[in-house]
Amino acid sequence: MSESRKLFIKTYGCQMNVYDSERMAEALGAKGYVLTEVAEEADMVLLNTCHIREKAAEKVYSDLGRLRPLKVARPDLKIGVAGCVAQAEGEEILRRMPLVDLVVGPQSYHRLPDMLERTEGGARVIDTDFPEEDKFEHLPERKALRGPTAFLTVQEGCDKFCAFCVVPYTRGAEVSRPFARLMAEARALVEKGVREITLLGQNVNAWSNDGRGLGGLIRELARIDGLERLRYTTSHPNDMADDLIEAHGQEPKLMPYLHLPVQSGSDRILKAMNRKHAAEQYLRLVERIRAARPDILLTSDFIVGFPGETDADFEATLALIRAVGFGSAFSFKYSARPGTPAAEKPELPAELCDARLQTLQALLGEQQRAAQAAMVGRELGVLYEKAGRLPGQMVGKSDYLHAVHVEDPGARPGDLVRVRITASGPNSLAGERIGV
């Protein structure tokens, strides 16, 4: 295979997909492919997809349609669909989109080079199995790092079976990667210049291996010289073990930020969602987390318009939001996903869902602006990730995951500095460097 072949990857959805796209690029890099940011010049286009909402899935088909002129002009162009839409729809993608050469599910990325080779003879290839072998054992060593931060998948899959969610069907059962392999990969990342690692999993705090839970893993990772920061996402409230909560108060390298989805503040809706916890349990959990780390910034996920949601249910969600005070949150109208239990229930009127979402987002936006404004005057650690748009400007992330713009000529990505926050905006902060 020619060393000059180019690969374009479009990534949809969660951080796990970002990580998976990096690993697929590395797997194909071993076959001579180099990344390009221009689809028109690529020899292979790979869409790494998200199936969590209907709009995300339909966007994939729309984007595939836009690739048709490229395929017509260059029949040798290879087009692949990866990720959760690939896993969920499989053969349907090949049926609807004749231009697609291969379809690969999240658990089969290590087979991608072989699949691509099989398409060279004109075959259309699909692999959406859940293989017994560990895909991570068959992927090459990570090489192309884009900056001082990196994702590290520690856990995949989900056993929770929330009534609205496709993840258990597209990602499979919960599987924890071995402790020793994670430590080795983390050390290798640090040797390549990484200073912050975010641990990933569909239910990352369900990770367990070798007698350790996620709190124990974090404590061991924190002992790696040169690794300055740790984060993890996404968590389920039912898997917030005591040891993990204690780590937030005891481990300085674990950043004071936690994404803890709750979805609703109504016990009736939480039960219908099969979340297996009540609103009061979530509130007590928040109290325990803040007792361990009082300055922690909490974010969450919310769904409005779940089948059967009444005005009282929605008001209960607003009450929970007011009680917690979130730094930010992702919020969506309910989207029925085929094959999930909730998809069989009658949906609420779209106008009602739109109105509830607008009300919810107004409250969340108010809390986010307040959280941003509260940072003004504080001194925070900021890890520079890239140059800003203005001359001499750097952009990095604060301890609380805020984007921070700092005028700091001569600084470089990877510098970890102290910054006094001088201004807050809707989605970022500005500050001045005061030290290291």
Curated annotation (Swiss-Prot):
Major site of localization recorded for this protein: cytoplasm
Cofactor(s) named in the record: [4Fe-4S] cluster
Radical SAM core domain segment(s): 144-373
Subcellular location per the Swiss-Prot or TrEMBL entry: Cytoplasm
EC code: 2.8.4.3
Transmembrane residue ranges: none
Catalytically driven reaction(s): N(6)-dimethylallyladenosine(37) in tRNA + (sulfur carrier)-SH + AH2 + 2 S-adenosyl-L-methionine = 2-methylsulfanyl-N(6)-dimethylallyladenosine(37) in tRNA + (sulfur carrier)-H + 5'-deoxyadenosine + L-methionine + A + S-adenosyl-L-homocysteine + 2 H(+)
Cellular component terms per the entry's GO annotation: cytosol
Cofactor binding comment, as recorded: Binds 2 [4Fe-4S] clusters. One cluster is coordinated with 3 cysteines and an exchangeable S-adenosyl-L-methionine.
Binding-site residues, [4Fe-4S] cluster 1: C14, C50, C84
PROSITE patterns: MTTASE_N (PS51449), MTTASE_RADICAL (PS01278), RADICAL_SAM (PS51918), TRAM (PS50926)
Oligomeric and partner information: Monomer.
UniProt function note: Catalyzes the methylthiolation of N6-(dimethylallyl)adenosine (i(6)A), leading to the formation of 2-methylthio-N6-(dimethylallyl)adenosine (ms(2)i(6)A) at position 37 in tRNAs that read codons beginning with uridine.
Protein name: tRNA-2-methylthio-N(6)-dimethylallyladenosine synthase
Organism: Cereibacter sphaeroides (strain ATCC 17025 / ATH 2.4.3) (Rhodobacter sphaeroides)
Gene this protein is translated from: miaB
